[in-house]
Amino acid sequence: MKFSVFFSFLISLYSGLWGDKRPNIIFIFADDWGWGDLGCHGHPYLKTPNIDRLASEGTDFHRFSVASGVCSPSRTAVMTGHFPARYSIDGHFAWVPSNQKRNMPDWLNPQAPLLTRFLQEAGYATAHYGKWHLANDMIPDSPLPTAYGIDEYGAFNCAGPQMFVHDDVKMALPFIERSRELGKPFFINLWMHEPHTPFHVDPKLQAEFSELDEADAIYAATLLHADTRIGELLNGLDEIGITDDTLVIFSSDNGPARGAPNTPLSLTYDTATGLGYGLGAAKGITGGRKEYKGSLMEGGIGVPFIARWPGKIPAGKVDQTNIISAVDLVPTFVNWLKSTFLQTTAQTV
């Protein structure tokens, strides 16, 4: 079966799509966000008005899949355009003994072909805010994100100081302003923590789901918090006046995590993100797709993929035809930018 590069049909529709002006690009990559965990995908009680807004103002691609059912290999694929096995990355980066046991490196090789570096070389200001996990905070000598073609960053699951998980949009908006003042297009990896454990809950948001049991309310509040920050980002683009010049993508690294049946609600601690609720509050759903995080079934790798670019990408469209893989992203962007094209395992059309 032939994989199409996402938006390939749009390129044929819009000759001279970019002209002399390159769009800004924001890639929102959630963590463990299930395909069914969106209002626009029919969830019965989750509130995701801002992601739903992206869907109503853009195209919702239903046949997108990532390259792994877990974090680090999935992120490797979107950054390199290669399947993660090429780099012997088949699980999440952990501490050194664990990586050695699995014959994994301790971090992604910074010399790999990288989306951020291609964009940087094409004149983009590049930034990364949120989860990293192309190394690990338990490996203090691992390369920082700046070694990967990234101009500015705030991150966790990396060496050095750990960014507070809810500061992603707070840090991204000033970067957008600075890039605009410099007259440079920008690319932002906004790799959100939600809804990975630990769940860090705002009590005011949890109170909006008082009709639910505690675990469901915690999960719903966690996703609402992420959606609210996405709304702040979209409103910021509106206020600055660059909405029409900005491609915004929302997706997830893999499907939702689920604990064993009757997993008790309890607190758990993560060295990068701190204290919060554990798998007892993991209530993500896949919209009927089989299996969950960690699986190569559709529930583990079939994730949301919504793209908005006003005037360029059709609004309010649901695409159930185009088959898209995460490894298609790098060659698509590189091809659009007319940079030196790399050899990848993906195909262009």
Which residue stretches match the model-derived regions?
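N-terminal export leaders
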Residues: 1-2, 25
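Sec-dependent N-terminal signal peptides of Gram-negative exported proteins
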Residues: 3-18
